[in-house]
């Protein structure tokens, strides 16, 4: 069995193809396919099964070589006696046994089992699926094919293409034969002319038959052109070699081009399937595209499009367009229109020109057909695909005519087309593109993948040639690839089978690409050609896809392929198959032969490819796989679904993938190349799967099957995309055997398949429990990813996906689905006709297999995905989001930028790379995970990835792609990879990653994950979505679902699965979905963190988390699943994160640790995030994921970046990017690891980590620290850097952050990403946070934040979005705060825990923070570590990052994270957070509750902590302390504080860090830190801030400034100080500050002040300075410092804020810092604001500040007291208290640190009043916080201004000038509302950020404020620049100034406990963020008891959920209660009550 040889992927396959080719093919031609689903071993892969005995074993000589440790040398034998007989499976006495999954059956030695089509098999722990291929029939055709081969051989030139035309005809014939294609054939011919017209080439080839040629020609030319070969044949040939060369070149080229093209293609593909083609065409030559389009459109559409297919076409088209790839597949079926198809093929061929075209041309007959089909198809497909409609139309026409035939054709075409298309053009470049496309196309990702794949493909292509050559030497000779392809097709068609196969190989390559590109179409193409293509595709796909996506996809496809092989196409398009039956048969035979072989080969190839590509792919695949998987699937789905979005997503993904791939490639390149060639690398195997594809060349045939699969898969991918239907379908698929067949015929099938695939995967996964869930998530995520991307796209996408999927699905689905169904129905016949039966079976089998594979893949992918998802999701999401946002393009730019950065990073990362690589590998490996050390790394990476993913995703992501991306970059290499993996594509890295990540990330980051994801902002919602926004927040699960929105959607759709999936990551993903996945993914990261922290953190987190968990739980649970910790989600997250993370992390961590530290970071970060995230838990978690990721990535990324970046610069970029990226990336990157390595420092580095590390590190991180520490070191420096970075970020970040923060956030998103990165990154935490932040945001939004969190990716994205938005910020805010809170909580929790510890943290934090930090610090580290680390890290980290991030996110997260750290603070903050939550309380409550409860708990803890820790007293005190400002502080503070606090905390930590941190936060952090700074400041802040801090006002001002400044200064100083850290000490001192407590209020403050004074020493510097500046601050600071802690804590937050103040002196710096902070804040002002506002909010605060300043302070205290009282008031507090306690407890838990800290702090802190206050304070704080916030804000604002360290956040506007002004004036860009002190916008808008800022009472200013301030050289008083928008004020009947005034006086929702149902818009996470910012408490679940001021906000669709509230008499209100109420600052529930009548009527 050549099959065995196949193992030699390339050579073997070639040989196989070649040799086998010669044989008529039965032999040669695979009769079945064994799809190995993606798993921890690698991406999905298809192995062709030939007649005779196919040995499955570990030995290379085995037909199905599975080089995995669990597989025996000769594990089992699959004996196929005849193509029409069921294969017999026998176990060969393997050690781990062989089992049949459905029904369950264990095969004992000697026991025989007859395999049914699509039966799921488990070899040891490797899930596979058998697909029957319908090969034989095609044999006859093959003869001609063979002939074709000759032409091909001879031809190799375009002219030969004519042959193709002939072939096409023949093919058509075959098709016709099979299907009625003949008529279509004619049509085809006719169509072809159209094609011709379309394609210039065609004209030359004018003749009808030649048309095919023409098409080919056209394509060829195009391709040629593309390749530059100029002539198709030549080109093909040349290209072929070129491909090889080009491959690499392309890879490079393609990377760029890819990027470019990819972008274009992606975009286009995304937008249309076309893109891929377009890209290819574009790349190749527009003509091709045109051709394709024309053909497709003209031909196809004109032809029959009009026909019913119009409809289909339309849907297809639309879907096609939208889904394009997916749809494409569907369309492809239509495309099948054999005639058209042929035409298409030709065109495709043309398009593919290169190999396919040429091959096709050469192949002419069969080849031609195929080629044409392929070529045309590809081209067409791409176009068509892009615009499946066209194709579909055509196809449809034909399809309608010959629905079956069409399907087949379509399939074939699709496959072929994509294949060819890519192959031709892509063959060389296109192919890779195609591959990429394919992968991407698969969904929209095709493009991405394509690019990546392209690159891979190139390599592969090189391989391909081999295969093709083998197969069709002539072909080979000719550009075999193409020729090969052709040949294969030919072969397939006829004896040409071989050629076909070869062709397939070549074509496959191309096709794969194309296929991927136009997966839907590919299906068609696939059918005929797709066999080959399929095989290829899978291979390529796998490889390209990162395997994952594709893998899953591919595998699905592959899985499908096998069936589809012959049937795969069918499967893919069962319809196609059926349609293609004739062709299919040919193909089938071919396929069978090829398929089996190919499949087999493919599988192997896939594996090999994975290996080879693996090397590349590994990363890519792993990454991609991971990422892609998610993406792939998701993307696929996403893309497919969202074409546009998908495109973006795809792009993102693609980018990610590509990047990944690239990186991977780089990484793996050796491997890839070698591996590629040596597909053997087992290691690569994993990758292999991915690589396999590459290898697939030889395996071409197999590949073909694979490809078929692939296309099918693509389709499946697509399908998965359509999880809903698809899912159903998928299952249906199984179910639908016959129907399936029909379905198969229908694209639907594939789609279904896809969906099914997804679902099954989902289910499967779920069933499997595979974590892959994330992948599943992918599935869901398909949605998820989609979500990610989708999500990113968010709801839209999800929607799209869902919608699309629904729409898409709907559109596609409906149409597609419906269409497919209908189509299927229609098609079925043909399929049936076609032998759909068998085929159908196969298809179904394939599908099954696919699904299985998908499952496996998904699973794996999920993991990957998870990672990716996270990343992807996150990233994707984010990416998507961002991408979506703009990001796409922007992204691209950014990508480039990122690429640079990445490169830089990469370089930098390089070192990390290795490690990172490992790490990356990890993610990437992820798949392999083991592979490489990746194990740990992988774990880490994976974790990271995952985490990242989670995080990322980046968000991934993605989210945070940017960040992640960057990070990824940094990490990149590894991380990216990881990230990429996670992020998806970091590896691919640069570009891809960038793009992907970036995209992803971007989206996440900028993007998302979110992202993820992707993601929400755009997706935000969804993006935030990411799940995030999604709903994630909503409820996690639910929210998640919503969040998931897409996810949920999916989730919903899939929920179950998703859920199931979810549970695994997906759940996360799903539920948390995003978050979770991220979390999950992130988790890992968190684990990182955790791990790092793990112990503590984890526990801490966990504990804390736990509470958060609670809320989280659901999320958690997803998380749980993910986390598993589930409930504990936080825990989970924490745990999970920690645990998971831990464990995941652990390994990861470990690695990371070392690695990372990162881990640390990661952990930390993640932790942070996690905490944060977790805290946010849901969000958090998501965040977490995100966060972590961010965190990590952040850190790492950042880190890396930082590190690299530390490079800061890059980092900035990175960070920025990474921020986002990181986030996303980070997310992925998260990888942190890389970060870790570096990063950490960097991030942790920066972020906190570093500092944190320092501090935290020391402290929490200590451990981390440790790791980190060093890092810290760095960090310090870097951190510092961080600071800078942070700051940097700040700067950049600012930019970024700003950008990111805002802009970016939005658009920037990317930047944001960046920003986030920076901040975020810092954020990292932030991101995390951010995410968190976002989360916060989201959460703030919380929902949003949450979402954000989730979003994180989203956040990230959102981040961007959220982030951006983050606005969400709110999220951040909220989240930040909320998040913070939430996150906080969780974070808190963790943080709390940590944070809580935070408490200690506070204490610690304060103390801890400071002390702790300082002293505790260590402990903290410990604890913090735990939490802290988490917190610390997170917090700190976050903080630091958080800081930055933290600041921003930081703030938020920071808070959160920080928070965590602060979290505690937050907590306190949480309170703050809560506050943040603001609601903190509420939120806490609410969320707190919800979380609060849990959060509360958490929150409490948090608050508590803060309180407690805050020293509670501190916090509380502080908190209460005005810190309450806390309130503000708290909330604001919390948030800010929180953030800040965290910062403080962190700072604290950081601070200690302080120095570092502080410093770290230091400024940079400042940014972050501001937060960080906070941290730093914190320290100082702490100190000052603290003192001041609270002074918050000062802080604000001071704080802000101070804080900021301080931070800055402090930072600096602090740094010193922190050093002082001590400051901390002061803190401690301050701490003692008991007075603090006392002072607490005044005294505290005062004390603080005084203390500060004391502190001043150190502080003084900054503090002092600031103080002076801040004046109050100073004192405050000092006191604060002293108090610091507490205050700090409390104040911390506040302090932070305040701190900031102190910075004043520093201020200047601080400004910087603040800037940073601001920056962080993004809004500088905001920060200020927040600070200010917050401060103001607290008037008390203010006073506080004053206090700090002392005057106020009394006041503040007073207020604080009041607040405090309030707080007490807030009973929540109590809970908080308890929580606090908990926190305290946690402290213990966290304890350790915390405890220590706690002890210290606690005592002091606690004692500090705190206690009493705690509860109270907490609440108070919370409340106050909220209120405070405003107050603070307000105050802050003033001070801030004064303080000069405003943390400015932008919403609705992207003002690079303004961002620069902020940074130049020493302010920072806030990443979330939570950490912002000023919100800058151009008009009144009801965005989450705007409402959160208004709720917090922070100044909402016009752009003129910044411009005038820039002119004045300092921040001008905001009062004169409040936004004026008479029109809107009139519309809404309110006055903004009055509303702000009321918000500062009192939190609008103080005392309110609000539950938001999942269907509400904005999503619950965002609503939660708003609620938190307004002082309300978010109830995570439906209240079960009555309580005054407890209300439920719902919408008509959720009325059924509101029976309980109605029964209880709880007011059930419309969302306008919040939206309008917050805008007017009037709480009038009675005016918005929804009556039972309305409900009933609804």
From Swiss-Prot:
SMART domains: FHA. Residues 457-476, 661-679, 819-837, 885-919, 931-941 have a biased composition (Basic and acidic residues). CDD domains: BRCT_MDC1_rpt1, BRCT_MDC1_rpt2, FHA_MDC1. It is found in: Nucleus; Chromosome. Residues 201-210, 1421-1432, 1462-1473, 1657-1678 have a biased composition (Pro residues). Keywords: Acetylation, Cell cycle, Chromosome, DNA damage, DNA repair, Isopeptide bond, Methylation, Nucleus, Phosphoprotein, Repeat, Ubl conjugation. It comes from the Eukaryota. GO terms for cellular component: chromosome; nucleus; site of double-strand break. The modification Phosphoserine is found at residues 168, 176, 195, 217, 291, 321, 364, 368, 386, 389, 394, 403, 447, 484, 494, 502, 580, 617, 619, 773, 786, 945, 989, 1027, 1062, 1080, 1381-1382, 1538, 1575, 1774. There is a cross-link at residue 1744 (Glycyl lysine isopeptide (Lys-Gly) (interchain with G-Cter in SUMO2)). Residues 1-150 are annotated as: Interaction with CHEK2. Residues 1-22, 139-159, 185-387, 419-585, 642-727, 747-1843 are annotated as: Disordered. Residues 54-105 form the FHA domain. It holds the Pfam family FHA. Its main location: nucleus. Residues 1137-1580 are annotated as: Interaction with the PRKDC complex. Residues 145-557 are annotated as: Required for nuclear localization (NLS1). The modification Phosphothreonine is found at residues 4, 146, 219, 293, 323, 370, 449, 512, 1146, 1187, 1228, 1269, 1385, 1399, 1440, 1507, 1522, 1541, 1563, 1579, 1593, 1634, 1754. Phosphorylated upon exposure to ionizing radiation (IR), ultraviolet radiation (UV), and hydroxyurea (HU). Phosphorylation in response to IR requires ATM, NBN, and possibly CHEK2. Also phosphorylated during the G2/M phase of the cell cycle and during activation of the mitotic spindle checkpoint. Phosphorylation at Thr-4 by ATM stabilizes and enhances homodimerization via the FHA domain. Phosphorylated at Ser-168 and Ser-195 by CK2 in response to DNA damage during mitosis, promoting interaction with TOPBP1. Ubiquitinated by RNF4, leading to proteasomal degradation; undergoes 'Lys-48'-linked polyubiquitination. Residues 1661-2042 are annotated as: Required for nuclear localization (NLS2). Homodimer. Interacts with H2AX, which requires phosphorylation of H2AX on 'Ser-139'. Interacts with the MRN complex, composed of MRE11, RAD50, and NBN. Interacts with CHEK2, which requires ATM-mediated phosphorylation of 'Thr-68' within the FHA domain of CHEK2. Interacts constitutively with the BRCA1-BARD1 complex, SMC1A and TP53BP1. Interacts with ATM and FANCD2, and these interactions are reduced upon DNA damage. Also interacts with the PRKDC complex, composed of XRCC6/KU70, XRCC5/KU80 and PRKDC/XRCC7. This is Mediator of DNA damage checkpoint protein 1. It comes from Sus scrofa (Pig). The gene is MDC1.
């Amino acid at each position: 069995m050549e099959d065995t040889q196949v193992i030699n992927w390339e050579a073997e396959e070639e040989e196989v193809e070649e040799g086998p080719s010669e044989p008529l093919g039965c032999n040669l031609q695979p009769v079945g396919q064994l799809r190995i689903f993606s798993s921890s071993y690698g991406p999905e892969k298809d192995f062709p099964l030939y007649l005779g005995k196919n040995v499955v074993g570990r030995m290379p000589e085995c037909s199905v070589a599975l080089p995995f440790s669990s597989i025996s040398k000769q594990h089992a034998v699959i004996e196929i006696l005849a193509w029409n007989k069921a294969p017999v499976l026998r176990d060969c006495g393997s050690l781990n046994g062989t089992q049949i999954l459905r029904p369950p059956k264990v095969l004992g030695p000697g026991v025989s089992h007859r395999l049914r089509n699509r039966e799921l098999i488990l070899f040891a722990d490797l899930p596979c699926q058998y697909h029957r291929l319908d090969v034989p029939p095609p044999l006859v055709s093959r003869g001609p094919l063979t002939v074709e081969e000759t032409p091909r051989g001879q031809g190799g030139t375009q002219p030969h293409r004519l042959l193709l035309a002939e072939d096409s005809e023949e093919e058509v014939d075959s098709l016709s034969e099979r299907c009625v294609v003949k008529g279509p054939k004619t049509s085809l011919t006719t169509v072809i002319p159209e094609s011709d017209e379309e394609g210039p080439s065609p004209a030359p080839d004018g003749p009808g038959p030649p048309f095919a040629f023409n098409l080919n020609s056209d394509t060829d030319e195009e391709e040629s052109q593309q390749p530059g070969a100029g002539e198709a044949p030549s080109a093909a040939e040349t290209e072929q070699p070129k491909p090889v060369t080009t491959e690499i070149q392309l890879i490079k080229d393609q990377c760029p081009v890819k990027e470019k093209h990819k972008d274009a293609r992606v975009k286009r593909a995304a937008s249309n399937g076309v893109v891929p083609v377009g890209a290819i065409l574009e790349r190749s030559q527009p003509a091709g595209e045109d051709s394709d389009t024309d053909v497709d459109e003209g031909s196809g559409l004109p032809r029959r499009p009009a026909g019913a297919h119009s409809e289909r076409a339309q849907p297809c088209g639309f879907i096609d367009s939208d889904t394009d790839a997916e749809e494409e597949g569907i369309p492809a079926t239509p495309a099948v229109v054999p005639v058209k198809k042929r035409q298409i093929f030709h065109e495709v061929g043309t398009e593919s020109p290169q190999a396919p075209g040429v091959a096709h041309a050469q192949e002419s007959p069969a080849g031609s057909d195929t080629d044409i089909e392929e070529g045309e198809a590809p081209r067409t497909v791409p176009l068509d695909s892009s615009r499946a409609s066209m194709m579909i139309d055509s196809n449809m026409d034909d399809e309608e005519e010959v629905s079956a035939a069409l399907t087949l054709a379509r399939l074939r075409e699709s496959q072929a087309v994509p294949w060819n298309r890519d192959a031709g053009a892509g063959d060389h470049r296109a192919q890779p593109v195609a591959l990429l496309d394919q992968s991407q196309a698969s969904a929209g990702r095709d493009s991405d993948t394509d690019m990546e794949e392209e690159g891979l493909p190139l390599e592969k292509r090189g391989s391909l040639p081999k295969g093709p050559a083998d197969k069709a030497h002539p072909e080979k000779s000719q550009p075999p690839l193409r020729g090969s392809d052709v040949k294969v097709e030919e072969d397939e068609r006829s004896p040409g089978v071989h050629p076909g196969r070869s062709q397939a190989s070549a074509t496959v390559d191309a096709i794969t690409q194309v296929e991927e590109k136009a997966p839907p179409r590919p299906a068609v193409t696939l059918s005929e050609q797709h066999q080959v293509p399929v095989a290829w595709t899978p291979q390529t796909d796998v490889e390209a896809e990162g395997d994952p996506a594709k893998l899953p996809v591919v595998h699905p496809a592959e899985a499908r392929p096998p069936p589809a092989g012959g049937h795969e196409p069918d499967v893919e398009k069962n319809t196609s198959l059926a349609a293609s039956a004739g062709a299919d048969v040919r193909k089938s035979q071919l396929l069978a032969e090829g398929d089996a072989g190919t499949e087999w080969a493919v599988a192997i190839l896939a594996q090999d490819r994975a290996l080879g590509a693996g090397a590349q792919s590994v990363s890519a695949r792993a990454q991609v796989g991971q990422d892609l998987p998610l993406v792939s699937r998701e993307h696929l789905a996403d893309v497919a679904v969202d074409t546009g979005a998908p495109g973006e997503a795809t792009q993102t993904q693609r980018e990610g993938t590509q990047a990944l791939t690239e990186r991977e490639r780089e990484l793996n390149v050796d491997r890839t190349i070698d591996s590629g060639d040596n597909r053997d690398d087992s290691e690569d195997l994993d990758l292999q799967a991915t690589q396999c594809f590459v290898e697939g060349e030889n395996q071409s045939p197999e590949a073909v099957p694979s490809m078929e699969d692939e296309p099918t898969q693509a389709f499946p991918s697509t399908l998965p995309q359509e999880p809903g239907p698809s899912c159903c379908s998928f299952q249906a698929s199984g179910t639908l055997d016959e129907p399936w067949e029909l379905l198969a015929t229908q694209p639907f099938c594939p789609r279904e398949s896809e969906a099914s695939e997804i679902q099954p995967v989902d289910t499967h996964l779920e069933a499997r429990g595979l974590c892959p869930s994330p992948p599943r998530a992918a599935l869901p995520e398909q949605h998820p990813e989609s979500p990610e991307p989708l999500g990113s796209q968010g709801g839209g996408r999800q929607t799209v996906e869902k919608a699309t999927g629904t729409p898409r699905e709907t559109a596609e689905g409906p149409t597609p689905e419906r269409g497919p169904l209908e189509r299927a129905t229609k098609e079925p016949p043909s399929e049936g006709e076609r032998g759909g039966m068998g085929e159908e079976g196969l298809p179904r089998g394939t599908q099954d297999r696919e699904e299985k594979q998908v499952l496996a893949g998904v699973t794996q992918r999920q993991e990957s995905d998870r990672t990716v998802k996270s990343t992807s999701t996150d990233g994707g999401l984010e990416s998507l989001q961002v991408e979506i946002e703009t990001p796409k393009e922007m992204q691209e730019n950014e990508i480039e930028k990122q690429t640079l950065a990445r490169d830089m990073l990469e370089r930098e990362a390089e070192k990390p790379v290795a490690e990172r690589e490992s790490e990356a590998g990890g993610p990437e490996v992820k798949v392999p995970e083991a592979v490489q050390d990746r194990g740990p790394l992988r774990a880490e990476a994976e974790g990271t990835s995952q985490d990242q993913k989670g995080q990322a995703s980046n968000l991934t992501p993605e989210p945070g792609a940017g960040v992640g991306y960057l990070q990824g970059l940094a990490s990149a290499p590894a991380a990216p990879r990881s990230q990429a993996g996670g992020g998806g594509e970091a590896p691919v890295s640069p570009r891809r990653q960038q793009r992907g990540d970036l995209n992803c990330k971007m989206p996440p980051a900028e993007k998302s994950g979110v992202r993820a994801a992707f993601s929400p902002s755009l997706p935000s919602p969804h993006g935030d979505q990411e799940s995030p926004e999604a709903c994630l927040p909503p409820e996690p699960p639910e929210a998640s679902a919503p969040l998931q929105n897409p996810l949920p959607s999916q989730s919903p759709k899939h929920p179950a699965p998703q859920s199931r999936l979810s549970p695994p990551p997906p759940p996360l993903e799903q539920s948390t979905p995003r978050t979770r996945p991220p979390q999950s993914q992130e988790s890992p990261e968190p684990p990182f963190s955790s791990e790092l922290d793990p112990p503590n953190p984890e526990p801490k987190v966990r504990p804390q988390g736990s509470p958060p968990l609670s809320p989280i739980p659901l999320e958690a649970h997803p998380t749980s699943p993910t986390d598993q910790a589930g409930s504990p989600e936080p825990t989970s997250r924490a745990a999970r994160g920690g645990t998971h993370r831990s464990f995941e992390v652990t390994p990861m961590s470990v690695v990371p640790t070392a690695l990372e530290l990162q881990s640390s970071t990661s952990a930390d970060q993640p932790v942070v995030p996690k905490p944060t995230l977790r805290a946010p838990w849901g969000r958090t978690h998501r965040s977490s994921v995100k966060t972590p990721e961010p965190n990590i990535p952040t850190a790492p990324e950042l880190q890396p970046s930082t590190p690299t970046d530390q490079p800061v610069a890059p980092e900035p970029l990175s960070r920025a990017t990474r921020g986002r990226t990181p986030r996303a990336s980070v997310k992925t990157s998260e990888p942190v690891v890389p970060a870790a390595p570096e990063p950490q420092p960097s991030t942790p580095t920066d972020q906190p980590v570093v500092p944190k590390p320092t501090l935290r590190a020391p402290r929490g991180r200590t451990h981390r620290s440790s790791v980190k520490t060093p890092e810290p070191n760095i960090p310090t420096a870097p951190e510092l850097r961080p600071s800078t970075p942070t700051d940097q970020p700040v700067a950049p970040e600012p930019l970024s952050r700003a950008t990111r923060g805002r802009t970016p956030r939005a658009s920037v998103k990317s930047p944001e990403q960046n920003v986030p990165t920076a901040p975020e990154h810092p954020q990292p935490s932030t991101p995390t946070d951010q995410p968190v932040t976002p989360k916060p945001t989201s959460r703030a939004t919380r929902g949003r934040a949450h979402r954000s969190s989730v979003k994180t990716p989203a956040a990230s994205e959102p981040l961007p979005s959220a982030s951006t938005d983050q606005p969400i910020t709110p999220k951040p805010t909220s989240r930040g705060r909320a998040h913070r809170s939430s996150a906080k909580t969780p974070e808190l929790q963790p943080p709390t825990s940590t944070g809580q510890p935070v408490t200690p943290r506070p204490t610690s934090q304060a103390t801890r923070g400071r002390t702790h930090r300082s002293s505790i610090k260590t402990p903290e580290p410990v604890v913090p570590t735990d939490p802290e680390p988490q917190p610390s890290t997170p917090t700190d980290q976050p903080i630091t990052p958080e800081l930055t991030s933290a600041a921003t996110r930081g703030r938020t997260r920071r808070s959160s994270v920080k928070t965590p750290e602060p979290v505690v603070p937050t907590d306190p903050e949480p309170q703050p957070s809560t506050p943040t939550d603001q609601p903190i309380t509420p939120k806490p409550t609410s969320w707190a509750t919800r979380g609060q409860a849990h959060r509360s708990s958490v929150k409490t803890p948090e608050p508590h902590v803060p309180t407690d820790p805050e020293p509670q007293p501190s916090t509380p005190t502080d908190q209460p302390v005005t810190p309450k400002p806390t309130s503000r502080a708290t909330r604001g503070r919390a948030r800010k504080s929180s953030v800040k606090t965290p910062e403080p905390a962190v700072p604290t930590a950081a601070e200690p860090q302080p120095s570092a941190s502080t410093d770290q936060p230091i400024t940079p952090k400042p940014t972050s830190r501001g937060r960080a700074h906070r941290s730093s400041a914190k320290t100082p802040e702490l100190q000052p801030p603290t003192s001041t801090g609270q002074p918050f006002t000062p802080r604000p001002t001071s704080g802000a400034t101070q804080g900021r400044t301080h931070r800055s200064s402090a930072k600096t100083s602090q740094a010193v100080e922190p050093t002082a850290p001590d400051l901390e000490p002061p803190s401690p001192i301050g701490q003692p500050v008991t007075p603090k407590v006392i002072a607490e209020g005044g005294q505290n403050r005062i004390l603080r002040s005084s203390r500060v004074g004391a502190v001043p020493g150190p502080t003084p510097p900054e503090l002092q300075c600031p103080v002076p500046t801040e004046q109050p601050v100073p004192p405050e600071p000092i006191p604060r410092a002293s108090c610091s802690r507490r205050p700090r804590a409390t104040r911390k937050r506040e302090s932070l804020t305040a701190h900031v103040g102190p910075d004043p002196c520093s201020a200047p710096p601080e400004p910087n810092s603040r800037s940073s902070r601001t920056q962080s804040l993004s809004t500088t002002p905001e920060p200020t604001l927040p600070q200010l506002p917050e401060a103001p909010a607290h008037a008390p605060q203010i006073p506080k500040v004053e206090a700090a300043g002392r005057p106020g302070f009394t006041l503040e205290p007073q207020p604080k007291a009041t607040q405090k009282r309030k707080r007490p008031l807030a009973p929540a507090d109590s809970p908080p208290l308890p929580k606090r306690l908990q926190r305290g407890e946690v402290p213990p838990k966290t304890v350790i640190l915390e405890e220590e800290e706690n002890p210290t702090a606690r005592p002091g802190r606690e004692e500090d009043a705190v206690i009493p206050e705690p509860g109270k304070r907490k609440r108070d704080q919370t409340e106050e916080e909220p209120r405070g916030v405003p107050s603070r804000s307000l105050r802050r604002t003033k001070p801030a201004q004064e303080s000069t360290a405003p943390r400015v956040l932008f919403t609705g506007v992207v003002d690079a000038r303004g961002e620069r002004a902020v940074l130049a004036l020493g302010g920072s860009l806030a990443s979330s509302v939570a950490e912002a002190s000023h919100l800058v916008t151009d008009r009144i808008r009801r965005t989450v950020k705007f409402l959160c800022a208004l709720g917090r009472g922070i100044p909402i200013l016009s752009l003129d404020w910044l411009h005038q301030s820039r002119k004045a050289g300092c921040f001008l008083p905001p009062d004169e620049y409040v936004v004026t928008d008479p029109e809107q004020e009139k519309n809404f009947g309110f006055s903004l100034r009055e509303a702000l005034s009321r918000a500062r006086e009192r939190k609008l929702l103080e005392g309110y406990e609000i539950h938001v149902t999942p269907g509400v818009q904005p999503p619950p996470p965002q609503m939660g963020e708003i609620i938190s910012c307004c002082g309300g408490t978010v109830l995570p679940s439906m209240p079960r008891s009555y309580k005054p001021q407890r209300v439920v906000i719902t919408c008509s669709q959720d009325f059924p959920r509101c029976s309980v509230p109605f029964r209880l008499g709880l007011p059930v209100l419309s969302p306008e209660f919040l939206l309008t109420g917050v805008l007017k600052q009037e709480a009038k529930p009675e005016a918005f009550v929804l009556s039972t009548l309305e409900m009933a009527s609804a």
